[in-house]
Amino acid sequence: MPIQRKELPDVGELVVATVKEVYDYGAYLTLDEYGGLEAYLPWSEVASRWVRSIHDVVKPGQKIVVKVIRVNKRKKQVDVSLKRVTDSERRRKMMEWKRAQKAERILELVAQKLGKSLEEAYEAVGKKLEDYYGELMAAFEEVVIRGEQALREAGVPEEWVQPLLEEIKRHVEVKRVKIAGVLTVRSLAGDGIERVKKVLLTVKDAIENSSPDIKVKLYTVGAPRYRLELEAYDYKTLEKALAKALEEGEETAKSLGVEFSFTREKQ
């Protein structure tokens, strides 16, 4: 169960719930992110289209995403709606929920290594990482990319740094994205081969110097065509590096009297 940061949800908040009991007039749910707090789903908030029975829509044990529509703070009563949740909201919330569960399992493993409880781990490092990166799993992904620096920046106590680093690298994988295309570099000069090499090296160096996260491959597919492949953790980094490399490559080519063009592959 995800760690509870506050006692009650806010009106308008999307929450993950487990259906507990279903009656003709509505259903009772437990809110997974709020320590099993009970919520009521009125029959009128079950579906936007006509359905014969509430039992056709929700069943005991089912995991659903609902929107909070009323909160009585004094009585700690919460009413929710299923019909006001769009498909995209449901998918996004369930993804966030699964990411939170995975992140907390990793945090629990680290806590066990240090002889701490999950609650102690959350107080010591979880809150800091959430406050700094917005989400625990987002913090862990940043650690995969940047290493222990990402933990220290968020104020993680030193005793937690190495255990966190070990478990994060063991359990979290950040997918890399790719851009590819073909450079056409041609020279009819007597020393054309050397001129072409200089242009290609300019492009490759510009990419490698733009970010340590980028992996670059540049190889011939049959002169004067050369395949360029860039790989990193996000497209923004790649686009910036590619634009700079092509600009520098074109300038070098122009100064050497070399034909230069780039055709990008569709993704």
Curated annotation (Swiss-Prot):
InterPro entries: NA-bd_OB-fold (IPR012340), S1_domain (IPR003029), S1_IF2_alpha (IPR044126), TIF2_asu_arc (IPR022964), TIF2_asu_C (IPR024055), TIF2_asu_middle_sf (IPR024054), TIF_2_asu (IPR011488). It comes from the Archaea. One of its GO terms (molecular function) is translation initiation factor activity. Keywords: Initiation factor, Protein biosynthesis, RNA-binding. Residues 12-83 form the S1 motif domain. Heterotrimer composed of an alpha, a beta and a gamma chain. eIF-2 functions in the early steps of protein synthesis by forming a ternary complex with GTP and initiator tRNA. Belongs to the eIF-2-alpha family. This is Translation initiation factor 2 subunit alpha. It comes from Hyperthermus butylicus (strain DSM 5456 / JCM 9403 / PLM1-5).
